[in-house]
């Protein structure tokens, strides 16, 4: 540690360098951009010509083939860009490129629910560098995005508050830089697992923070430390609303990372992206899925994921629950505080949306050892069976369990109860549920009753009391 401090001090003592670019301004390698404990290596960003940032416009009229636009107003006027629509600008991260399928797939989901100008930013000329260099190139790309936003306002009358920047990884900090350069006038910035190395713990002027837009929300999916866990995302809160799905570190469906001993951040990405970065990539997959599942990513205000998992943060508060992803800006209390933390669980496959329920079961019948399961039936569909309790089943006992259904069942109409013995029981005992209450995350409770008991592996249907 002493050597690192000495190294940083010596770097900071060296006279800083500066580069200037037309319309974008000047960029220095002085602190806090370089020569600090968090950013020990001094570097200047590459030129706009070398980075070659491109803006790829998709609209409802051209969903499959982009139109290339620039910050020149004439190119925008000659495109399908509509000033009466919201503009969402998607910015990729390290090693990535603007023509990856995930960006256009996100646009296509938007077209299913809204009329929108969807611009994918391609800055692969600057992202496919060493990581330390790419973190400096972020500044130039952010300046170019800010220039585009300013031209939309000055030349086309399209206000910044109708612009939404969505950045993944380093792209989150590109969005933050653009927000700073437009003095927080941009309507919304969404950070999708904002990159940790060279940003965590740095001053706000270096990274994404809540002052960069009128509303900033963030999704954290790879928040374990970079060393030794190889977590690429920030654990630090950066927005008005910060969501930590599945606790924010290990996402369902992602294998444990066997490359966790690699510590050279300039070499960890190439060739390992799809495997090593599974948690990191989940953030944009969740966002894409949230667009077509407007109620499937409810976040619960909680002090920690452990407390959330202990069923102590249900149901939603008086203002409801914010939705992680596309509809986070619909939450009434979105900007009442900074760094509000929310937790939720997701699925492990392509359909990531989940709906949380609390089930309370009061048992009847005989005393046995076994486990009980419940399935929900509503006007929106039927859930699969979920285990509520396993152990000694006593008549009159009440068991409570929260679970995350892959189906929004809507208004509950009935429930089905089933139980199984843990051991062979020749007496063929009968067990039932005299009452089952189901609470949704909005606080509405549905009550169901039955006087019947059943043998194991026999369904018991309970109707509304």
Curated annotation (Swiss-Prot):
SUPFAM superfamilies reported in the protein's UniProt record: alpha/beta-Hydrolases, Lipase/lipooxygenase domain (PLAT/LH2 domain)
Disulfide bonding pattern of the chain: 20-26, 107-118, 254-278, 302-313, 316-321, 449-465
Keyword Metal-binding on entry: yes
Cited Pfam families: Lipase, PLAT
Regulation: Inhibited by bile salts, is reactivated by (pro)colipase/CLPS.
SMART domains: LH2
Identification of the protein by name: Pancreatic triacylglycerol lipase
Lineage of source species: Eukaryota, Metazoa, Chordata, Craniata, Vertebrata
């Amino acid at each position: 540690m002493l050597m690192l401090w000495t190294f940083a001090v010596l770097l900071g003592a060296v006279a800083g360098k500066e580069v200037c670019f037309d319309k974008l301004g000047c960029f220095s390698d002085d602190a806090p951009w370089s020569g600090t404990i968090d950013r020990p290596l001094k570097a200047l960003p590459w030129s706009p010509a070398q980075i070659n940032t491109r803006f790829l416009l998709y609209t409802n009229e051209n969903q499959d083939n982009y139109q290339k636009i620039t910050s020149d107003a004439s190119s925008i006027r000659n495109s399908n860009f509509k000033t009466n629509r919201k503009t969402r600008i998607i910015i990729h991260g390290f090693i990535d490129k603007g023509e990856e399928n995930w960006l256009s797939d996100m646009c296509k989901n938007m077209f299913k629910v809204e009329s929108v100008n969807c611009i994918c930013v391609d800055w692969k000329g600057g992202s496919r560098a060493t990581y330390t260099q790419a973190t400096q190139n972020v500044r130039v790309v952010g300046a170019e995005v800010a220039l585009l936003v300013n031209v939309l306002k000055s030349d086309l009358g399209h206000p910044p508050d109708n612009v939404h920047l969505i950045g993944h990884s380093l792209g989150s900090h590109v969005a933050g830089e653009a927000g700073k350069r437009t003095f927080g006038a941009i309507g919304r910035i969404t950070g999708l697992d904002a990159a940790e190395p060279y940003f965590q713990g740095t001053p706000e002027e270096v990274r994404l923070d809540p002052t960069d837009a009128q509303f900033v929300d963030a999704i954290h999916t790879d928040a374990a430390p970079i060393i030794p866990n190889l977590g690429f995302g920030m654990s630090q809160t950066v927005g008005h609303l910060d969501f930590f799905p599945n606790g924010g570190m290990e996402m369902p469906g992602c294998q444990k990372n066997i490359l966790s001993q690699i510590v050279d951040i300039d070499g960890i990405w190439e060739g390992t992206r799809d495997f090593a970065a599974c948690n990191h990539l989940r953030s944009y997959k969740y966002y894409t899925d949230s667009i077509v599942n407007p109620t499937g990513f409810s976040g619960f205000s909680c002090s920690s994921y452990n407390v959330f998992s202990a069923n102590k943060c249900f149901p939603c508060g008086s203002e409801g629950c914010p939705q992680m992803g596309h509809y986070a800006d619909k939450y009434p209390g979105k900007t009442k505080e900074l760094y509000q933390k929310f937790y939720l669980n997701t699925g492990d496959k392509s359909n990531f949306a989940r709906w949380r329920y609390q089930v309370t079961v009061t048992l009847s019948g005989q005393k046995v050892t076994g486990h009980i399961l419940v399935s929900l039936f509503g006007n929106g569909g039927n859930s699969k069976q979920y285990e509520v309790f396993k152990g000694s089943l006593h008549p009159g006992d009440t068991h409570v369990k929260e679970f995350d259904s892959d189906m929004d069942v809507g208004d509950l109409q009935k429930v089905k109860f089933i139980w199984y013995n843990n051991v062979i029981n020749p007496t063929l005992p009968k067990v039932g549920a005299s009452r089952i209450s189901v609470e949704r995350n909005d606080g509405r409770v549905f009550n169901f009753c039955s006087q019947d008991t059943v043998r194991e592996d026999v369904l018991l249907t309970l109707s509304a009391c």
